[in-house]
């Protein structure tokens, strides 16, 4: 190898070391900084995922409390658990990314800057030393030859000249070998650093592959079952169906009629969730359980009995209407008129019905028949104002407004009708209105059936009648004195007098269609929900 070739290789060696120190290490530091940002972002995703799946578990708890969606709650729990395992795998990948890549690279780059500086300095010092030794031998040989040329006996310097030539040849070989080895060492150092980076990145990729493989395995195993669970939203679980069947077959209970309001299968949703029925009053307790499914008929206000799932109360009242009244409107037309305004459907809990003794003793109330117009619908008069607010399914009206009912019976104290003044339709509290007689006068709305009342307590008393304070409402009004005395607040529901009193009145006035038409209420004063004080 010539001297010029050795010098060129020496420059290449120095360039390799300088490239590592001036380009590779700064780029590696930038890579580590970007990796830390990536790690921070993944940590944020992990934290957000925990909150997300905690919320999913909460939704599963809500579903598990429902009789109709219990298995969907189990599915949500499984989803949360599967994704929790996937998230744990992601956290393991994040730990490996931090420990096996970022930490080790950061340690290497700090040590490497000092190591490379020392290695380059050592190489340059050794190369300079060998080069200086070679230059010294060459200078000595040059002096010797100059002496030999001026001497009278040149043969005297020939042996020594040969020794210098051999020494120069050896030192030049050593320098060339050292430069060659130095270049090889520099390339090896550079390659080792890139190999270390690739090796650590492979470890991260391996953990990432394990993460995705684990997620795929868990999801592929569970996903078909989850999709099957939600394939039919209209299917009622067997457990809920058996429960309804047991309640239907048990003594003193009725078949749930929430799925059908008429022969046209008109579905009417519950407008207000959480409304609870009144307990069975003591006067009616002896009659509960003696139900005859063949003779169950509506008692009052169009409320159907136990076997009335396909019963049409409007059609059944044809005999009670005057001959001048036209046939009632078909349920299919009613469905078209207000089906789009009904609230979201909720399942209705089956409620107890009363025995047929009441049905045989007490005929159906004529209050609803009296309130029917010529179009076959019942009319009521508002005794309090009602504001719907932002709820588009509710009906707003003022005191004194007339409302035409569009459905045959109330739902948990709420009725659906159309205001004759504003022509708007919606749900409204039935206790805010009175049924109109055929002559246009209004009468107090009363209901004997416990299952259709919206009151929150047992307001029936053997001897007294009291109206509770309103459950909601800010303004106070005086209740009409001709019916229930003077009150300062709105009633939420209206109770009826003693059942035994109704039997006596009916026995004395068998010609009347309504045994409670002439019942006079005793004025009372009460400040809370306890028993009223007679004035």
UniProtKB/Swiss-Prot annotation:
Membrane topology: Peripheral membrane protein
Keywords: Cell projection, Coiled coil, Cytoplasm, Cytoskeleton, Membrane, Phosphoprotein, SH3 domain
Any single GO BP term: regulation of synaptic plasticity
Region annotated Disordered, chain positions: 308-370, 445-486
Tissues with expression: Ubiquitous.
Assembly: Homodimer. Interacts with CDC42 and RAC1 that have been activated by GTP binding. Binds TIAM1. Interacts with ATN1, ADGRB1, DIAPH1, EPS8, SHANK1, SHANK2, SHANK3, WASF1 and WASF2. Interacts with ENAH after recruitment of CDC42.
Official protein name in the record: BAR/IMD domain-containing adapter protein 2
Source organism of the structure: Rattus norvegicus (Rat)
Lineage of origin: Eukaryota, Metazoa, Chordata, Craniata, Vertebrata
């Amino acid at each position: 190898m010539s001297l010029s070739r050795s010098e060129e290789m020496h420059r290449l060696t120095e360039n390799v070391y300088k490239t590592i120190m001036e380009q590779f290490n700064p780029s590696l530091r930038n890579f580590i900084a970007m990796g830390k940002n990536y790690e921070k972002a993944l940590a944020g995703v992990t934290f957000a995922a925990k909150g997300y799946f905690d919320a999913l578990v909460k939704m599963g708890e809500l579903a598990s409390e429902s009789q109709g969606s219990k298995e969907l709650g189990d599915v949500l729990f499984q989803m949360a658990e599967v994704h929790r395992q996937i998230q744990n795998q992601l956290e393991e990948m994040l730990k490996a990314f931090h420990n096996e890549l970022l930490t080790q690279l950061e340690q290497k780059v700090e040590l490497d800057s000092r190591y490379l500086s020392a290695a380059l300095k050592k190489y340059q010092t050794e190369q300079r030393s060998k080069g200086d030794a070679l230059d010294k031998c060459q200078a000595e040989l040059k002096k010797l030859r100059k002496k030999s040329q001026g001497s009278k006996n040149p043969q005297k310097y020939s042996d020594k000249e040969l020794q210098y030539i051999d020494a120069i040849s050896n030192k030049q070989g050593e320098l060339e070998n050292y430069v060659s080895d130095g270049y090889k060492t520099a390339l090896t150092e550079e390659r080792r650093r890139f190999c270390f980076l690739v090796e650590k990145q492979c470890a991260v990729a391996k953990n990432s592959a394990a993460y995705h493989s684990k997620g795929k395995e868990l999801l592929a195993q569970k996903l078909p079952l989850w999709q099957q669970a939600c394939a039919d939203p209209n299917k009622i679980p067997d457990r809920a169906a058996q429960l309804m069947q047991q309640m239907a077959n048990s003594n003193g209970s009725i078949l749930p009629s929430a799925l059908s309001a008429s022969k046209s299968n008109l579905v009417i949703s519950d407008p207000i969730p959480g409304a609870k029925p009144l307990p069975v009053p003591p006067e009616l307790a002896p009659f509960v359980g003696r139900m005859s499914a063949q003779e169950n008929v509506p008692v009052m206000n169009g409320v159907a009995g136990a076997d009335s799932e396909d019963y049409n109360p409007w059609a059944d009242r044809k005999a009670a209407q005057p001959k001048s009244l036209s046939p009632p409107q078909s349920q299919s037309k009613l469905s078209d008129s207000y089906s789009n305004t009904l609230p979201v459907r909720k399942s209705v809990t089956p409620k107890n019905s009363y025995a047929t003794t009441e049905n045989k003793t007490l005929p159906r109330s004529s209050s609803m028949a009296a309130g029917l117009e010529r179009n076959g619908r019942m009319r009521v008069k508002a005794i309090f104002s009602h504001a719907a607010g932002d709820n588009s399914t509710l009906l707003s009206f003022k005191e004194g407004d007339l409302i035409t009912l569009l459905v045959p019976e109330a739902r948990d104290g709420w009725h659906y009708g159309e205001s004759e003044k504003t022509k708007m339709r919606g749900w409204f509290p039935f206790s805010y209105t009175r049924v109109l007689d055929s002559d246009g006068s209004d009468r107090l709305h009363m209901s004997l059936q416990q299952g259709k009342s919206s009151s929150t307590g047992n307001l029936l008393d053997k001897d007294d009648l009291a109206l509770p304070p309103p459950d909601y409402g800010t303004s106070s009004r005086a209740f009409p004195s001709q019916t229930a005395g003077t009150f300062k607040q709105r009633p939420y529901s209206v109770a009826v007098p003693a059942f035994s009193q109704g039997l006596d009145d009916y026995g004395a006035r068998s010609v009347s269609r309504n045994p409670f038409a002439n019942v006079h209420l005793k004025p009372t004063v009460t400040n809370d929900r306890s028993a009223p004080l007679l004035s």
